[in-house]
Amino acid sequence: DINASNYGLTFGFHSRIDDRVQRVVSKIDVGNLYINRNQIGAVVGSQPFGGNGLSGTGPKAGGPRYLQRFAMQNLLPLGQLVPPRLTLKEVSNALNINPKFQLPATVDLPGPTGESNRYILSPRRRVLCMGPGSKEYAERAKLLGCNAVAVTLCTNALILVEELDAVICVGPAATEIRKALSARNGPIVPVLMDENFEMWLMREQSVCIDTTAAGGNAALLAS
């Protein structure tokens, strides 16, 4: 079982059967997946690169989340947070704008004729929320499709939790939680310490398919 190895950088697969291809894409846990392609290697601008599990913990290089990883949020003390004065029209407009964060999505990326490149976001499934605000964070994580649970747990007990994809803890306890998780075997579990954690609860996957290898592609006739 490839997924059981906990390594998931790249995976190549050849098949002319579309149903089989879709089944593999939906089940394999790797960062970059190549279908019917004669080489396994990411192309800048088409396939953001990075793995899952023991093959990587950060955002994909060349992906939309890459620069965010080098930034740190600077929160103001609560006493300095002064709400702006808005007119009723401004309030109405603010309530009706599109949200900045969308639910799991698939984005088509550019590539040569005869090649499909998709960037896929999917939720991390098993998420523990600890510390102050944990109940609120769990509810927010559930909206993304995560199986999130708010718990009060001794940090040393985290090593006993067998399946875990992420821990949310905004507060001083996060450092101890990170140390405890480092003693676990298997994939590195990220500790999310920023209140704007939604994007970090999403897994990234790049899927590249050579559409010409399946016996023809009608889309090529119009290109």
Feature-to-residue mapping (PLM):
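Conserved C-terminal structural/oligomerization subdomain of aldehyde/semialdehyde dehydrogenase
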Residues: 1-223
